[in-house]
Amino acid sequence: MLRGYFYAQMREVPLAQVRGRQIAIIGAGFSGSLLAVHLLRRTGPEDRVYLIERSAGFGRGLVYASGNPHHLLNVRAGNMSAFSDQPDHFLEWLRALPENERSAVSVSEDRLTFVSRQLYGSYIQHILGREIWSAESAHRLYLIADEAVALHPAGAGYSLEVAGGLRYEVDAAALAMGNFPPEGDARGYIANPWSQGATADLDSDAPVLLVGTGLTMVDTVISLLDQKHRGPILAISRRGLLPRRHAAVAPHPRFLPAGEAPRSLRALLKTVRAEIRHATALGRDWRAVIDSLRPDTRDLWRNLPLEEKQRFLRHLRPWWDVHRHRMAPSVASRIERALERGQLQIRRARLGRLTPKRGGVEVELLPVAGAPAEQIEAERVINCMGPLSDLSRVAAPLIRGLLASGAVRSDPLNLGIEVSGEGAVIDAAGYAARNLFAVGPLTKGVFWETTAVPDIRVQCERLADHILERVAPKISEDVPAKMGLG
């Protein structure tokens, strides 16, 4: 439905005939799709939103493109509404699905269901599709199935070029490119664990090495188990930590004083540990304490000095990740069973030299405790360290061009793009752009919690308001442009 609408509409709407605001969103995963919806609901009949996505999966992005129904969300369905003012929106959509589409999904009244990422991607596509066909948004949202490769200043706005050679003149642009997959496959080594062939064509009895022990590793193990892999699976990381299991817990009240967030990591850690001890003494679960931090995480992060953030990334991030980003119970049970029978092992080690050999690769493991290096063999090594955040290593031509021109710069922690508190990108000279923005995982270094739906949905709402504050409607000026399919 989405692709058909796009191709039917793009031939007949020359931009020079439009006098409203023209806003481009680059990337159509959750962040870009939801930002588009909020912009459409806040703009008038002459305004246009162009949603640009290089893949065919509008609304899915990297995270929700998984075709494996056993790759589950790590947030309960009751917390996964795309709209903060409609907390049951996702649950209502689930309950309205035909039984044959719900598959094994069980939506209970306690809202604790964990559904597949594949199904959640369908939910986002449903939202996008309904917006396209609504009377209020008709002929105002255009899906461009192409890769944005360049963005150049043009008058008061930008000229956006796509790989197919077309250019679009827009008043503002938002970068919503989500997570960048790692690149650099080699013989016996898979850099991108989300690629379709990551676990394909393996001897079912062959040893596999996974580098990383977080949620990406968990998904990869589930994929291997689903394809009846019987061979040993070794997962390594410097600390050997495994994500904790979700559990049903009663909510814990917010406990940090408003406006008095600690400015040192030591003080913050002391406060949280004390609250966990207090909660435990009352018979409550540590998970509830960690979850109660969600409304405050953005302010906590922004309040920490740069040196404290760097200290967090060096020393505490792995511990935070495994306690904050937990496994769905059914997934945790499968991982635990694989550990109990010895098929899955988790060790503290670092990856050393890889030497291709017949039938696989010889791997040098570097123990973290000073023990001598160890040589093992595996048919395949799969990188499970998560998305690529170092922009200097990202191959996307748009990002490379924006960095080279100085239009954007990496944040000081090298986790993404530096932006203002409102989401305007910061250029190489340190100035906030008037009409270039970023949203979602690209802004992780500034806001930290920008990878989960409950956080991104609020960010998209705020950014939509800010964009429209910065980009005033045009009165009568026609803007020349090239537009169409040929």
Ranges and model annotations:
Residues 67-89, 253-267:
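N-terminal glycine-rich dinucleotide-binding loop that anchors FAD/FMN and/or NAD(P) in oxidoreductases
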Residues 85-109, 298, 302:
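A conserved beta-strand/loop capping segment in the N-terminal third of enzymes
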Residues 75-91, 284-297:
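Short, amphipathic alpha-helical segments
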Residues 6-56, 60-62, 105-262, 270-473, ...:
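Flavin (primarily FAD) cofactor-binding/catalytic cores of flavoenzymes
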